[in-house]
């Protein structure tokens, strides 16, 4: 039997769907036909199309009505909707095609919707008449004829069989109760058996003396709250009849509102207690008090009408439960905007101040229906929804709040904080304020994307919206219950909660806040403020015995110290002594958390900030950061194989101290005393790149003081120094270690023959030249360290030119044509240091040219003449080859073999360097040119060549531009050469430069010994000073 029923249901459903599908197809054809019509088409065709549409709609309505009742057992309210839609479709009419008539029909429908007759105010007549035309005597006669009505009327049953009504077609009002809506548990209790059996004689006898009170004078809000539904909700089919109208006996004759605490006077009139008391107070004399209804004299004695109060309360409970059902149906349907608004308002009035009704709303599943209305197109709907949600959340327990945050999409609520409609914006903030009182809700709000950022923004925009600012501030204070929210506030720019909990919270909270300080990115403008507020608390945690607290505090302090302006604050709170004690004093739990590493990091950050550290005391004995005590302990730790991370910070500390001459002298002294240079050189080979780079930088800083010692020990280290030259395949692969390694080799003393010989290797020099070519060719496609690497490589080549007396160095310079390499580098680089080094290399090479240049030797012919060979096989050419002699060096010269600057075309490039802004480049170029004016060469020829290249003016311009003593000495020496060896021509040109005369006078007055002597000589030769041939006594 069950199988047959299931099969029939399936067949029935298929028939229904097929029928609906056929109707839709017919409707589509009618639409196509209507679209094809034009203005010339006859009215008859239009009416036929309309009639076709009307038939299709009615057919679909009949099909919907045939859906079995069993389909909606679990969700009966859907059946109500389907039946309502079916009735409307069956009664649907379509106009006759006339545009004006259709408009009139539409206007009539709209006006019909707003007709007040549709929503009739109803009141039960069992206790008191509700019609003002119905007199009290008539009512008594009616009561006697209806003896069964003397008791309190029965509440309409909820068990009416609606399915039976549908089946038999009986749709009268008396039978159209809303049974399809799921029942909501009621708080009301059944009326006692005494009340059922007529034991209300006393209250009834008192009530019969009260004259008729017109129901239309009742307060409208009271009627709305406890009685009638709104117009839009009353339009719901088969729903409104479930509402129980208010009884006339419930209305207070004074306030015209439903009574909350009814009391009966001695005249038998029942009124609201507070209203009666106010009525009594309005009389000055108690003897003049009259009944407000009967006019009889009264005393102030009142008796509580407990039975009526109970009846009113139970009536309210029943109607409130019914209102919840009606609102559930309205929100489920998602009808018109007005219907949704009225449903939300009814729910709010029903739940306001009544915890039980809020529970009923939650259990009825209404909250689940509300989420979609957060994105409703109407701002009024969103406003009412937010108000209602706030009402649900406003309760003593957190159940309502938790259900809201679990069900409602919090991101939608957060978006409404930015609404352009101020009421919506304020309602959203009020809801969040109420929700934020719950711990669970605080977590959910914090996880909503952008929630805290928008609240922080609103808090700071007090000028734009003071209410939003104050409310957001309260919400944020509530959200502080969740530590993760505090972190988000700090990330959004609100740091006070984090700093406040760090300063005053429990130790566990302080640890969490300290960890957040490391994780968040604080703007530069607030880092100093954070340091001022956080450092005292962090110092306290550092001195705690809790390992987790100490670890978090050390990391936070290290993070704070990275911002250099903060370090002054750290020094003021006494961090130096605490960190030094952590580094030099053994503690039981120091090794457990590597506090030495953290302390060294903080000290290194402080020293790198550039503070004057020489006066910072490290202990109570007066030792400072630059003292032997501190430096010795640092180097001792570095020498004794400390962990790599600690060694990195120790090297950073020494590098910072090396910037002070006094501290540098101490470091050099301790290194020599402890022989720690070997340990530092060994660190170069460490696989940790950062440690290796740090060690190389420290060795570079020590080079001017113990360079030869470092060179000797570097050569004794396994794999060194050749391993320091590692040339990458591509220019963009150059690392910092490549650059500092080459720089160390370039900075070590150039005259150290041991190191130079260790570097003389055909493959090494070839790699250097290849790397230089690679960098020049790559242009902008290079690493950030490419320039430093290039400077180091050129410096290594220059060091080879300082020991050319060694045959291997001479062979290397000739074989690789270093002269041409340096000449090319003068112009093909943007680095001033490379230019300076290239000019220095040319100077070193050119200083040997005179020695290497030899006059051409006559070829011996004795041996060749003794050979008798045919004339055609003679080795002598028919024309002797002319050998050119260098006019300056008086011999055979070449750029490759004798390093002649003239043959290498280097003079013009060196003179161009005189126009550089860098004094070091100009000085090196002058030094290279000076080799052409040495007494061993043909000075006159050199002067003539330089004069043709405008060298005199370039030298004078360099003197005017730069004031360095060593540069002035070289420039004055060259000018003196031009005056002495060049004759009056050059002397006249030089003497006409007035600025030069002033500079010579200034150098004569304030220059050092050599510069002053040279200036004096030039002034004498220019007749600016008297020349004494004999001593005058």
From Swiss-Prot:
Keywords: Repeat, Transferase, Ubl conjugation pathway
Region of interest (Disordered), residue spans: 145-226
SUPFAM superfamilies documented for this protein: ARM repeat (SSF48371), RING/U-box (SSF57850)
A single BP term in Gene Ontology: protein ubiquitination
Molecular functions per Gene Ontology: ubiquitin-protein transferase activity
Pathway: Protein modification; protein ubiquitination
Polar residues bias spans: 200-226
CDD domains in alphabetical order: RING-Ubox_PUB (cd16664)
Residues in U-box domain copies: 245-322
Its EC number(s): 2.3.2.27
Catalytic activity: S-ubiquitinyl-[E2 ubiquitin-conjugating enzyme]-L-cysteine + [acceptor protein]-L-lysine = [E2 ubiquitin-conjugating enzyme]-L-cysteine + N(6)-ubiquitinyl-[acceptor protein]-L-lysine
ARM repeat ranges, renumbered to this chain: 483-522, 523-562, 564-608, 610-659, 665-704
PANTHER family xrefs: RING-TYPE E3 UBIQUITIN TRANSFERASE, U-BOX DOMAIN-CONTAINING PROTEIN 42-RELATED
Function: Functions as an E3 ubiquitin ligase.
The protein's name in its UniProt record: Putative U-box domain-containing protein 42
Organism expressing this protein natively: Arabidopsis thaliana (Mouse-ear cress)
Organism ancestry: Eukaryota, Viridiplantae, Streptophyta, Embryophyta, Tracheophyta
The encoding gene: PUB42
């Amino acid at each position: 039997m069950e199988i047959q029923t299931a099969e029939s249901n399936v067949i029935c459903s298929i028939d229904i769907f097929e029928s609906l599908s056929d109707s839709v197809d017919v409707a589509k054809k009618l639409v196509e036909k209507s679209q094809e019509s034009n203005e010339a088409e006859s009215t008859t065709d239009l009416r036929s199309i309309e009639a076709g549409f009307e038939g299709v709609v009615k057919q679909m309505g009949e099909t919907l009505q045939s859906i079995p009742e069993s389909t909606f057992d679990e969700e009966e309210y859907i059946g109500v909707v389907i039946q309502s839609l079916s009735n409307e479709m069956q009664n649907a009419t379509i106009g006759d095609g006339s545009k004006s008539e259709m408009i009139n029909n539409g206007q009539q429908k709209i006006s019909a919707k707003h007709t007040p007759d549709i929503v009739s105010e109803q009141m039960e007549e069992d206790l008191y008449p509700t019609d003002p035309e119905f007199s009290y005597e008539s009512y008594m006669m009616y009561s006697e004829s209806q003896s069964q009505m003397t008791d309190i009327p029965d509440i309409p049953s909820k068990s009416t069989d609606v399915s039976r009504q549908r089946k038999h077609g009986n749709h009268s009002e008396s039978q159209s109760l809303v049974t399809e809506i799921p029942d909501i548990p009621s708080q009301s209790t059944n009326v006692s058996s005494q009340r059922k059996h007529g034991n209300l004689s006393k209250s009834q006898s008192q009530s019969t003396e009260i004259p008729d009170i017109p129901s239309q004078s009742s307060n409208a809000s009271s009627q709305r709250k406890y009685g009638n539904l709104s117009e839009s909700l009353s339009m719901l089919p088969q729903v409104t009849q479930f509402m129980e109208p208010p009884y006339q006996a419930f209305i207070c004759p004074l306030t015209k509102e439903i009574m909350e605490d009814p009391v009966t006077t001695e005249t038998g009139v029942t009124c609201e207690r507070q209203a009666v008391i106010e009525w009594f107070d309005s009389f000055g004399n108690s003897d003049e008090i009259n009944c407000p209804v009967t006019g009889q004299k009264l005393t102030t004695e009142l008796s509580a009408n407990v039975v009526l109060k109970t009846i009113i309360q139970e009536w309210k409970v029943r109607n409130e439960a019914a209102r919840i059902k009606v609102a559930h149906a309205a929100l489920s349907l998602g009808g018109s905007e007005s219907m949704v608004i009225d449903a939300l308002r009814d729910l709010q009035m029903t739940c306001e101040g009544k915890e039980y009704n809020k529970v009923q709303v939650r259990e009825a599943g209404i909250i689940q229906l509300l989420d979609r209305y957060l994105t409703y197109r109407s701002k009024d709907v969103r406003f009412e929804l937010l108000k209602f949600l706030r009402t649900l959340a406003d309760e003593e327990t957190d159940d309502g709040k938790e259900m809201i945050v679990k069900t409602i999409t919090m991101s939608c609520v957060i978006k409404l904080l930015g609404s352009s409609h101020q009421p919506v914006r304020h309602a959203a903030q009020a809801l969040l304020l109420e929700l934020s009182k719950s711990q669970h809700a605080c977590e959910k709000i914090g996880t909503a994307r952008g929630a805290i950022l928008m609240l922080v923004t609103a808090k700071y925009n007090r000028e734009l919206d003071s209410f939003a600012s104050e409310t957001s501030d309260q919400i944020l204070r509530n959200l502080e219950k969740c530590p993760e929210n505090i972190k988000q506030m700090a990330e959004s720019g609100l740091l006070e909660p984090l700093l406040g909990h760090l300063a005053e919270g429990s130790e566990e909270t302080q640890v969490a806040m300290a960890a957040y300080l490391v994780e968040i990115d604080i703007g530069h403008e607030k880092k100093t403020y954070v340091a001022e507020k956080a450092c005292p608390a962090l110092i306290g945690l550092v001195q705690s015995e809790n390992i987790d607290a100490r670890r978090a505090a050390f990391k936070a302090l290290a993070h704070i110290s990275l911002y250099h302006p903060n370090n002054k604050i750290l020094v003021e709170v006494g961090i130096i002594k605490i960190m030094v004690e952590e580094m030099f004093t053994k503690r039981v739990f120091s090794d457990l958390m590597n506090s030495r590493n953290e302390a060294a990091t903080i000290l290194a950050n402080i020293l790198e900030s550039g503070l004057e550290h020489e006066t910072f005391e490290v202990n109570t004995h007066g030792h400072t950061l630059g003292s032997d005590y501190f430096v010795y302990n640092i180097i001792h730790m570095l020498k004794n194989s400390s962990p790599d991370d600690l060694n990195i910070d120790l090297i950073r500390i020494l590098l910072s101290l090396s910037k002070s001459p006094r501290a540098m002298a101490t470091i050099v002294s301790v290194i020599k005393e402890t022989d720690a240079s070997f340990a530092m050189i060994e660190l170069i080979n460490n696989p940790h790149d950062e440690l290796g780079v740090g060690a190389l930088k420290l060795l570079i800083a020590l080079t001017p003081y113990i360079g030869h010692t470092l060179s000797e020990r570097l050569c004794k280290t396994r794999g060194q120094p050749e391993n320091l030259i590692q040339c990458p395949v591509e220019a963009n692969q150059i690392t910092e270690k490549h650059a500092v390694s080459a720089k160390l080799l370039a900075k070590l003393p150039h005259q150290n023959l041991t190191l130079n010989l260790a570097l003389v290797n055909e493959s090494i020099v070839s790699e250097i030249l290849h790397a230089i070519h690679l960098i020049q060719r790559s242009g902008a496609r290079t690493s950030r360290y490419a320039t430093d690497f290039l400077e180091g490589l050129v410096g290594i080549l220059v060091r080879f030119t300082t020991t050319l007396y060694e045959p291997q160095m001479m062979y290397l310079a000739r074989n690789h044509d270093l002269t041409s390499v340096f000449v090319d580098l003068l112009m093909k680089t943007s680095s001033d240091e490379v230019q300076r080094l290239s000019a220095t290399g040319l100077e070193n090479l050119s200083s040997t040219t005179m020695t290497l240049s030899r006059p051409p030797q006559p070829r011996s012919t004795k041996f060749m003449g003794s050979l008798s060979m045919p004339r055609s096989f003679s080795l002598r050419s028919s024309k002797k080859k002319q050998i050119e002699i260098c006019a300056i060096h008086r011999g055979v010269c070449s750029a490759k073999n004798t390093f002649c600057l003239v043959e290498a075309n280097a003079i013009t490039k060196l003179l161009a360097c005189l126009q550089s802004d860098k004094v070091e480049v100009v000085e090196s170029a002058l030094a290279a040119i000076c080799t052409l004016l040495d007494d061993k060469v043909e000075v006159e020829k050199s002067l003539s060549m330089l004069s043709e290249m405008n060298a005199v003016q370039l030298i004078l311009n360099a003197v005017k531009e730069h004031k360095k003593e060593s540069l002035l000495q070289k420039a004055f020496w060259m000018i003196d050469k031009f005056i002495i060896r060049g004759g009056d021509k050059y002397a006249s040109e030089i003497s006409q430069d007035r600025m030069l005369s002033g500079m010579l006078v200034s150098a004569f007055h304030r220059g050092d010994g050599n510069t002053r002597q040279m200036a004096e000589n030039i002034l004498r030769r220019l007749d600016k000073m008297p020349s004494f041939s004999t001593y005058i006594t």
